[in-house]
């Protein structure tokens, strides 16, 4: 038997497979890319809708309406490609900049959600103009857009595009609008669901949900986050049915694209539209089955779903077809309703067999199932009836036909057949079905619908003219317009619902009536307390504001609001207009957006709306997500006290200045009428109308001139120096020198300061002369008496040491005296006359040594500064007043000031005082005269205020009630805490600083202490001391000192502070606070935040080693104790036992808890840590601090569970330190003091912000870089040349990386991310390379190194280095638990951990195909870091001390010093050396050199041998890999920077000889030498070849070093190109914290460019060989980023995997 016919033909099969493969490739090449993240159901829906298109899913974004938007984007692409240059109706704001082919865009004025879309529109490009016009109601700036709508615009265009923007325009109206534009073709995308053809109801389909209420249809697709489209049903029906428009503007409508029920309609103007019938839904997947029992009438009292039930139900076609086929073919005996229900239930279940779907199923509701069963049964019954009737009637007809005679047949043939349409079966005489009959059918199948309707054009010229006349007549009668015959425009443009970003817009075309709010309103601060809380106003300032009332007079005209706010004796004016820039106290700018029609205004995070109601003006303020609704009544308020208003204004000003000092971004500058006003917190156009023309206070509460820095701030009052009271009587004997010189009458008014007219202002000085009044007779001479001491009186002390005195500045011992001079520096009146009497030589211009502005400096006969204040009689000039004080700060030493200008020049005291406060130097003194003293006493900086709110008082009283019910607290019966403000002093200090000893018996009446032990201690000293409960009876009206105040129960602390006449708190904020023993939650709820007024840092109790351990909590602690080491472990207990829990106290008789020991001092203590104290110690480090600071000589630690080690108190740190030879002592700290850059030239202001994209594209063009299609490279793994590699079983890699980037052009060498294969490549490529050993003596290399580092002598390692080690660990969030005892048998002691670096290196070369492996960090164990770290730090300090002044090491220098050294080397060139594989080429020779230097410094031999051992053979432990290797340098060991720099110095000094070496700088493997010439030494080749060094030397006029550009004779300049290039590689996500960190880094970099920006452009462009315009553009780009206006792109890029194989070799 032959079987060849059953054998497949290979050629045919291959050809078919090739054709299929080619088709698949073609489909993928032309596939639609789906970018949003989709659920599984959404994916299935989209695949079904988009057939036969091929889809490629690349999820990278989240969309609110993903299904519609994918379809929309595809149809949009089709329309725009066909339309070309066109007019667009209703463009989405976000698409404006993306479509340059659009000639003109028609919009409507934004309302509803359209406003939100315009706010989120791009702010650059063409969209910016449209956005500005839309939001501000401005006319278009050009012809590219309009806000007249498609129907009202007349822009001529041949082709148009309307993407989901015609759903509320009838086809006839569109035809007229196209004719008005002269348009011949219009591509329109519309959403036309078939359900609109059905009666009202709710329709569930497989793709969407449609709710049809009879008038409108709302469609929501699967997975939409909000309601979708909302359209007029009648208009949608017209678009479905209409295929042409007839009349004056004929039109043909053709469906050219369809995706589901989304259509692209091509509207073409045609003179004679022909019939174009079409089937709109040939691929419909639903059949609509009628429900006999439809929805009922109106809803009843209780809501019901009946009214929303469908009269039709969407049934999948496969369900309905199978059900009808099954029912129609059943036997008559088997046909029944139950059998149909059983079959329907069976086919409704989804069945899958593996990946094959055997039955799709149907998830239907009960109503739908009932309707389907009913309709199917009745339909099948009707069909069976038809079948029976047709057969019966047919048989009868056959019998009748066959019984006819010949004559009858001839008659039928002659007369019936001719001229008639013959349809077989008509002669059966069957009945005809009516449309409304049940027999007409129960379902609607959209697949068979055919439409071809014509809509007449609505051109009714005659009717329109008649309507216009009628409208004008009605207007003449004063009635509303009734133009009911106008065509309905509906929603056009951005108000279209069917664009995926346009859902839910509500349109109200009617203009709202503008309501005038003019009138007078009463504003009280108590109404605005919730707003103050939202704004973050301090409680004391809010309390002041709550006591104030204001009257606000409002007038509105010309689209602006003018408010006149009267508060006490002050009147403030504000003007609200759109676009006004508000004052801010930071770099952030705020522009007021004001809409008088909508009665809204907003700026930054604040928004406000107002409405005039019958009760008054209702204002709704929303700030930072918190809202406040207030109703201001009409009328005039009772005036507030002038003193309270002044105090409020002063406190508000200080708050604004405090925010300006300490906040990075600042906020609004709050004016008085901004907090107690009608529209808080806005106060645009602030001005203060004062009745006193010379008060000058109108500038006190604004920041327009407050741009200078701050040298100090207010601090609590310190004790004044005891002195005599100021003279109060005229006949009191006084010293003539002590008189305020400004009240002395001048002999004649000087030309520079003419005499001022008299004024009643209290701020005016007391010059008694007047230009317009006769000179008063001189007062009788006062008797002169010389007192034995100075008569100045201390009024206030600032934290920086500056002081304010009452008296004469001639008593000062400051270096400089400041004279209130005139512009010509001639002898004048007032204080200037007093200076001339004492120091006449100081007015000689020839003796002036320098000038700063108007200020003149002289040293003859003593240091004096002649400062010039502005003349406020001529002009108020606050900026000049600021400059007058600022010009006196160009000096060394301290200065004594008067209040400049408050005499003859009539400068207000408060204004001059504030200017001095902002512009002085630490240690300066200010001397006030009597009128100024009165002002200062009224406005003196107060003590810290503790505000007790009503909630706090209520909670404290509850705690007092609970206390009163106990035996201990019975004294608290009837005691209450009232809301209010308490002023206090708080002396805080380190443990044992003598806080208690500083209290004298004459200064206090009652001492309140937390424990009995402290009470007994105070009583032994003779004080009346009480515990908190018993002290309730004695503290009222007394001077009270509260010891250990933070540990007192807060309700008792508040009670005593409120009852006392004065309260002085003692304590330590870092020690144990009050404990909530009852666990009622009341203690933490009312615990006050106490602000120390003094800090004492010298301890007389704690030994030196204790101070080092607790320095993290007390950075400035110092000790007077002579005990060096007091902490010991594993010794017998001594002295007082201290435990942490009551259980441990019971187990150790005689012990006391740490809480009880707080404040006590013992000679010897034993700390016993038990396991039950773990939670207490871990949650409260204060307990450990208290336990460690109770002894003076010795403390034994018994820590069996290791609890103290977990919080950083480790014996291993101390033991290892002393084991390595450490000593108690103090070296100089290693911190380099770095100053701030002054704005000398400030050329950076000449560089405006620029576009980041243009800057980076220009950088790419000049460097030759291109956009990288990948995120990282996994380079080929090199061969393992030495060592042993342990690999994981799974080498999983990530295929892609998600980043937020500034640009897609990366200018850095793209390395591997942190994943398995990258780690293996780095381990093998960096640490598995063969080491070239070099056996030679180190004498020659050490001798060459002497050129930079001479021979070092023995050094000592002190506790200073130990403290710096502990401080570094604390800053990194580490504790002492990782430092172990030095046991080399333990792997944890010597484990070296490997991490893969994730940062890349800037390069001007290839960024992808570089073929280099990544970089890693091999971190030594914390035990070795703690062992070697102090020694290496001490060696580093010794090297720094031995370096020549022109040799710079690492970062241990001030940047300006290196810049000055480079600037002082003109004529030199720059020698640069770049090491390749610096760490990998280090070997036994470099290690030996390190050990020689360690021996020179006196390091113990066992430590040197241990270091040599660890460096020569090691194991790197990665997360899942490990490598055993030899000799390589580790980047994470404690001496990495030190020994890398030393080896770099040694190689450079040994291999090269320099002529005229001026400057040398070394940092790690980076080095630069400034010299006139160089040559390679004769011994260089031996060292380079022996060690396998890879040096790349460059010698050029300008070089690069450590992120700066080195320009001899000019200095060092920031490397702008390198910094900008590295920014391109950074990931600015995923959270805003990372972006803010990088933005601050950009700000720091720009600060370095402040004075050298222009020079940097010229020099940096030369060193990189780029154009100066590029550097200029990069600086502008950095300013854009610093302003927070950078744009980030979220990208998901693949990882290029080039790894091949890893070869093992064991040695």
Curated annotation (Swiss-Prot):
Cofactor note: For methyltransferase activity.
Skewed-composition ranges (Pro residues): 747-757
Region annotation Y-domain: where it falls in the sequence: 241-439
Positions contributing to ATP binding: 989-996
Cell compartment(s), UniProt: Host cytoplasm; Host cytoplasm, Host perinuclear region
Signal peptide feature range: none
Disulfide bonds: 434-481
Annotated segments matching region RNA-directed RNA polymerase: 1221-1707
Domain called Macro: residue spans: 789-937
Reaction catalysed by this enzyme: RNA(n) + a ribonucleoside 5'-triphosphate = RNA(n+1) + diphosphate; GTP + S-adenosyl-L-methionine = N(7)-methyl-GTP + S-adenosyl-L-homocysteine
Location of the Alphavirus-like MT domain: 56-240
Pfam families: DUF3729 (PF12526), Peptidase_C41 (PF05417), RdRP_2 (PF00978), Viral_helicase1 (PF01443), Vmethyltransf (PF01660)
Region feature X-domain, mapped onto this chain: 799-956
Region (Putative protease): 442-509
Region NTPase/helicase, residue ranges: 974-1218
Described function: Methyltransferase: Displays a capping enzyme activity. This function is necessary since all viral RNAs are synthesized in the cytoplasm, and host capping enzymes are restricted to the nucleus. The enzymatic reaction involves a covalent link between 7-methyl-GMP and the methyltransferase, whereas eukaryotic capping enzymes form a covalent complex only with GMP. Methyltransferase catalyzes transfer of a methyl group from S-adenosylmethionine to GTP and GDP to yield m(7)GTP or m(7)GDP. GDP is a better substrate than GTP.
Subunit-structure text: The protease domain interacts with host EIF2AK4 (via C-terminus); this interaction inhibits dimerization of EIF2AK4 and prevents EIF2AK4-mediated phosphorylation of host EIF2A.
Name this protein carries in UniProt: Non-structural polyprotein pORF1
Organism of derivation: Hepatitis E virus genotype 4 (isolate Human/China/T1)
Organism lineage: Viruses, Riboviria, Orthornavirae, Kitrinoviricota, Alsuviricetes
């Amino acid at each position: 038997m032959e079987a060849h016919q059953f054998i497949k033909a290979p050629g045919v099969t291959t050809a078919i497979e090739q054709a299929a493969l080619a088709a698949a490739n073609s489909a993928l090449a032309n596939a639609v890319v789906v970018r949003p993240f989709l659920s599984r159901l959404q994916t299935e829906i989209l695949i079904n809708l988009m057939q036969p298109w091929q889809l490629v899913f690349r999820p990278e974004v989240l969309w609110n309406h993903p299904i519609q938007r994918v379809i929309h984007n595809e149809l949009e692409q089709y329309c725009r490609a066909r339309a070309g240059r066109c007019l667009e109706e209703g463009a989405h704001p976000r698409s404006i900049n993306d479509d340059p082919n659009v000639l003109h865009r028609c919009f409507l004025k934004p309302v509803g959600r359209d406003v939100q879309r315009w706010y989120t529109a791009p702010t650059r490009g063409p969209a910016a103009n449209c956005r500005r016009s839309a939001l501000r109601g401005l006319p278009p700036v050009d012809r590219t857009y309009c806000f007249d709508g498609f129907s009202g615009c007349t822009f001529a265009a041949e082709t148009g595009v309307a993407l989901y923007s015609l759903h509320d325009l009838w086809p006839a109206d569109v035809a007229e609008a196209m004719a008005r534009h002269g348009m011949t073709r219009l591509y329109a995308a519309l959403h036309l669901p078939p359900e609109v053809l059905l009666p009202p109801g709710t329709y569930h389909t497989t793709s969407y949900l449609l709710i049809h209420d009879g008038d409108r249809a709302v469609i929501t697709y699967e997975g939409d986050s909000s309601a979708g489209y909302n359209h007029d049903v009648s208009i949608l029906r017209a678009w479905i049915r209409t295929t042409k428009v007839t009349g004056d503007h004929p039109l043909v409508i053709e469906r050219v694209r369809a995706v589901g029920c989304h259509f692209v309609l091509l509207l073409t103007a045609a003179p004679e539209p022909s019939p174009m019938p079409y089937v709109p839904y040939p691929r419909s997947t639903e059949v609509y089955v009628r429900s006999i029992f439809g929805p009922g009438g109106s809803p009843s009292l209780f809501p019901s779903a009946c009214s929303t039930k469908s009269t039709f139900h969407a049934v999948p076609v496969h369900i309905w077809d199978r059900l009808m086929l099954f029912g129609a073919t059943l036997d008559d005996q088997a046909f029944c309703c139950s059998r149909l229900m059983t079959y329907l239930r069976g086919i409704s279940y989804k069945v899958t067999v593996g990946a094959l779907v055997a039955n799709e199923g149907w998830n239907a509701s009960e109503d739908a199932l009932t309707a389907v069963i009913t309709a199917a049964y009745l339909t099948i019954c009707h069909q069976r009836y038809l079948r029976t009737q047709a057969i019966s009637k047919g048989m009868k007809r056959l019998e009748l036909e066959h019984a006819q005679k010949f004559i009858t047949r001839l008659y039928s043939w002659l007369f019936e057949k001719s001229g008639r349409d013959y349809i077989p079966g008509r002669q059966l005489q069957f009945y005809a079905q009516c449309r409304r009959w049940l027999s007409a059918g129960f379902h609607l199948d959209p697949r068979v619908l055919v439409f071809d309707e014509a809509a007449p054009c609505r051109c009714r010229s005659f009717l329109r003219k008649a309507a216009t006349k009628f409208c004008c007549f009605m207007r003449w009668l004063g009635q509303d317009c009734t133009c009911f015959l106008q065509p309905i425009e509906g929603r056009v443009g951005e108000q279209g619902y069917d664009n995926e970003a346009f859902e839910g817009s509500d349109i109200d075309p009617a203009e709202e009536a503008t309501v005038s709010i003019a009138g007078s309103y009463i504003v009280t601060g108590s109404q605005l307390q919730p707003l103050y809380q939202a704004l973050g106003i301090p409680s004391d300032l809010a309390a002041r504001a709550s006591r104030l009332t204001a009257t606000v007079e409002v007038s509105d005209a010309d689209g602006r609001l003018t408010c006149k706010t009267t508060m006490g004796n002050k009147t403030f004016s504000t003007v609200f207009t759109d676009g006004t820039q508000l004052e801010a106290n930071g770099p952030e700018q705020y522009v007021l957006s004001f809409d008088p029609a909508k009665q809204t205004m907003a700026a930054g995070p604040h928004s406000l709306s107002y409405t005039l109601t019958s009760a008054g003006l209702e204002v709704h303020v929303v700030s930072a997500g918190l809202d406040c609704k207030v109703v201001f009544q009409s009328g005039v308020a009772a005036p507030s006290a002038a003193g309270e208003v002044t105090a409020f204004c002063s406190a508000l000003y200080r708050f604004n200045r405090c925010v300006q000092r300490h906040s990075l971004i600042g906020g609004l500058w709050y004016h008085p009428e901004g907090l107690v006003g009608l529209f808080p917190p806005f106060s645009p156009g602030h001005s203060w109308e004062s009745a006193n023309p010379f008060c000058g206070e109108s500038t006190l509460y604004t920041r327009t001139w407050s741009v200078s820095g701050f040298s100090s701030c207010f601090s609590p009052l310190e004790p004044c120096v005891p002195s005599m009271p100021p003279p109060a009587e005229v006949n009191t004997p006084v010293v003539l020198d002590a008189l305020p010189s400004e009240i002395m009458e001048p002999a004649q008014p000087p030309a520079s300061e003419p005499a001022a007219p008299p004024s009643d202002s209290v701020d005016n000085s007391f010059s008694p002369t007047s230009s317009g009044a006769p000179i008063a007779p001189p007062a009788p001479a006062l008797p002169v008496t010389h007192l034995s001491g100075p008569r100045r009186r201390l009024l206030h002390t600032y934290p920086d040491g500056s002081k304010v005195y009452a008296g004469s500045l001639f008593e000062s011992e400051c270096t400089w005296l400041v004279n209130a001079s005139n512009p010509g520096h001639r002898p004048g009146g007032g204080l200037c006359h007093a200076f001339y009497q004492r120091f006449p030589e100081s007015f000689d211009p020839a003796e002036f040594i320098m000038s700063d502005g108007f200020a003149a400096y002289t040293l003859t006969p003593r240091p004096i500064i002649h400062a010039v204040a502005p003349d406020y009689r001529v002009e108020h000039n606050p900026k000049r007043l600021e400059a007058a004080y600022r010009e006196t700060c160009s000096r060394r030493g301290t200065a004594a000031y008067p209040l400049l200008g408050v005499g003859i020049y009539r400068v207000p005291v408060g204004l001059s005082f504030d200017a001095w406060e902002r512009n002085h130097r630490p240690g300066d003194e200010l001397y006030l005269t009597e009128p100024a003293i009165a002002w200062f006493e009224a406005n003196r900086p107060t003590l810290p205020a503790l505000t007790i709110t009503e909630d706090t008082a209520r909670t404290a009283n509850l705690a007092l009630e609970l206390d009163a019910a106990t035996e201990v607290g019975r004294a608290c019966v009837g005691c209450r805490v009232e809301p209010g403000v308490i002023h206090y002093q708080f002396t805080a200090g380190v443990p044992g600083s003598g806080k208690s000893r500083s209290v004298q018996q004459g200064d206090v009446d009652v001492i309140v202490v937390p424990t009995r032990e402290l009470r007994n201690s105070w009583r032994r000293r003779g004080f009346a001391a009480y515990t908190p409960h018993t002290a309730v009876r004695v503290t009222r009206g007394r001077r009270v000192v509260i010891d250990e105040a933070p540990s007192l129960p807060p309700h008792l602390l508040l009670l005593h502070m409120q009852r006392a006449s004065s309260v002085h708190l003692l304590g330590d904020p870092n020690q144990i606070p009050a404990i909530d023993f009852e666990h009622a939650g009341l203690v933490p709820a009312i615990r006050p935040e106490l602000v120390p007024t003094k800090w004492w840092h010298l301890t007389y109790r704690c030994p030196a080693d204790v101070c080092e351990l607790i320095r993290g909590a007390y950075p400035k602690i110092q000790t007077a104790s002579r005990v060096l080491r007091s902490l010991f472990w594993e010794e017998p207990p001594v002295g007082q036992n201290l435990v942490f829990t009551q259980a441990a106290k019971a187990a150790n008789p005689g012990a006391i808890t740490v809480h009880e020991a707080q404040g006590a001092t013992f000679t010897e203590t034993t700390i016993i840590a038990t396991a039950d104290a773990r939670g207490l110690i871990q949650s409260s480090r204060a307990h450990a601090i208290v336990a460690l600071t109770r002894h003076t000589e010795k403390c034994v630690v018994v820590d069996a569970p290791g609890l103290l080690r977990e919080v950083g108190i480790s014996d291993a740190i101390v033991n290892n330190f002393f084991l390595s030879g450490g000593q108690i002592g103090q070296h100089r700290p290693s911190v380099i003091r770095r100053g701030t850059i002054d704005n000398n030239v400030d050329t950076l202001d000449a560089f405006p912000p620029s576009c980041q994209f243009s800057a980076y594209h220009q950088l790419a063009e000049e460097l030759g870089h291109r956009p990288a299609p990948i995120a990282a490279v996994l380079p080929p793994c090199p061969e393992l040349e030495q060592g042993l590699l342990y690999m994981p079983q799974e080498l999983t890699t990530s295929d892609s990386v998600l980043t937020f980037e500034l640009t897609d052009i990366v200018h850095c060498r793209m390395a591997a991310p942190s994943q398995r294969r990258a780690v293996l490549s780095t381990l093998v490529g960096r640490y598995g390379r063969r080491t070239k050993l070099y056996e030679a003596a180190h004498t020659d290399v050490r001798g060459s190194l002497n050129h930079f580092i001479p021979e070092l002598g023995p050094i000592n390692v002190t506790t200073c280095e130990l403290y710096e080690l502990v401080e570094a660990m604390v800053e990194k969030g580490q504790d002492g638990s990782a430092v172990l005892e030095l046991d080399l048998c333990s792997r944890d002691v010597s484990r070296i951990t490997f991490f893969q670096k994730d940062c890349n290196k800037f390069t001007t070369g290839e960024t992808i195909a570089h073929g280099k492996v990544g970089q890693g960090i091999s971190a030594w164990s914390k035990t070795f870091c703690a062992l070697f770290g102090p020694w290496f730090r001490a060696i580093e300090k010794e090297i720094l001390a031995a370096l020549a002044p022109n040799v710079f090491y690492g970062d241990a220098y001030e940047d300006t010093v290196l810049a000055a050294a480079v600037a002082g080397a003109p004529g030199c060139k720059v020698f640069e050396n770049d090491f390749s594989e610096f760490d990998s080429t280090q070997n036994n020779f470099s290690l030996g050199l390190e050990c020689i230097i360690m021996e020179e410094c006196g390091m113990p031999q066992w430590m040197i041998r241990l270091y040599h051992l660890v460096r020569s053979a090691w194991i790197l432990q990665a997360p899942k890999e490990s490598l055993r290797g030899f000799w390589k340098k580790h980047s994470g060991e404690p001496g990495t920077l030190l020994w890398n720099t030393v080896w770099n110095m040694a190689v450079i000094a040994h291999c090269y000889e320099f002529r005229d070496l001026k400057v040398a700088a070394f940092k790690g493997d980076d080095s630069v030498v400034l010299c006139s010439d160089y040559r390679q030494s004769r011994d260089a080749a031996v060292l380079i070849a022996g060690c396998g060094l890879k040096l790349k030397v460059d010698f050029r006029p300008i070089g690069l070093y450590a992120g700066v550009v080195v320009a001899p004779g000019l200095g060092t300049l920031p490397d702008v190109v390198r910094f900008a290039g590295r920014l391109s590689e950074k990931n600015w996500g995923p959270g805003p914290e990372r972006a803010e960190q990088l933005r601050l880094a950009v700000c720091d970099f720009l600060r370095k460019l402040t004075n050298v920006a222009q020079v940097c452009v010229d020099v940096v462009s030369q060193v990189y060989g780029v154009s100066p315009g590029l550097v200029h553009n990069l600086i502008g780009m950095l300013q854009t980023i610093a302003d927070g206006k950078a744009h980030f792109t979220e990208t998901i890029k693949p990882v290029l995997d080039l790894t091949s194989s890893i070869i093992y070799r064991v040695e």
